[in-house]
């Protein structure tokens, strides 16, 4: 694993001891989550900007930002302690390419247009698409990290999905919404 990803994992485990940001207690529990965050880089189109919704403890945004330092990432996280953790990461890791915004998706009013919108374990795909599509440029994609519940979601229809173990990567172009 990339040394910067190891640093991220170490810091997350340290913060978990007092702040309970994720369920992981050991590196062996975090490594698969980091691998999961990076897996889509094998199949998604290149992108120059990304909006991550509900960034939480930084998955998938922080591993992606560390692997793609040339890409601009905006991390939306409404909860104070998680936003504080993300800001701390930005101060101690080479993450000049991220901006942390302490807001809910529904409150965010920036007119930006990004190439990719990501989310992991936040909400139903239809809801995420409806509330976030205004931030996605016309050639952009949604990338949602989903479990088996995706099969029950309406947004799943006519969507390119990639499956690895129990993870379903929902990958849908904005232009398919028309």
UniProtKB/Swiss-Prot annotation:
Its main location: cytoplasm. Signal peptide: none annotated. It is found in: Cytoplasm. GO terms for molecular function: rRNA (guanine-N7-)-methyltransferase activity. One of its GO terms (cellular component) is cytosol. PANTHER family: S-ADENOSYL-L-METHIONINE-DEPENDENT METHYLTRANSFERASES SUPERFAMILY PROTEIN. This is Ribosomal RNA small subunit methyltransferase G. It comes from Helicobacter acinonychis (strain Sheeba). The lineage of its organism: Bacteria, Pseudomonadati, Campylobacterota, Epsilonproteobacteria, Campylobacterales. The gene is rsmG.
């Amino acid at each position: 694993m990339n040394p910067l990803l190891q640093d991220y994992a170490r810091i997350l485990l340290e913060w978990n001891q007092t702040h309970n940001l994720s369920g992981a207690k050991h590196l062996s529990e975090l490594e698969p989550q980091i691998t999961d965050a990076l897996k889509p880089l094998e199949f998604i189109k290149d992108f120059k900007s990304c909006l991550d919704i509900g960034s939480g403890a930084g998955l998938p945004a922080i591993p992606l930002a560390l692997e793609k330092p040339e890409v601009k990432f905006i991390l939306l996280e409404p909860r104070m302690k998680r936003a504080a953790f993300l800001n701390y990461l930005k101060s101690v890791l080479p993450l000049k390419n991220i901006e942390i915004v302490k807001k809910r998706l529904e409150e965010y009013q920036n007119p930006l247009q990004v190439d990719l919108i990501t989310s992991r374990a936040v909400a139903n795909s239809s809801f995420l698409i409806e509330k976030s599509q205004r931030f996605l440029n016309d050639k952009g994609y949604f990338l949602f990290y989903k479990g088996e519940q995706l099969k029950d979601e309406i947004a799943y229809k006519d969507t390119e999905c990639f499956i690895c173990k129990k993870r379903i990567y929902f990958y849908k172009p904005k232009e398919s919404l028309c």
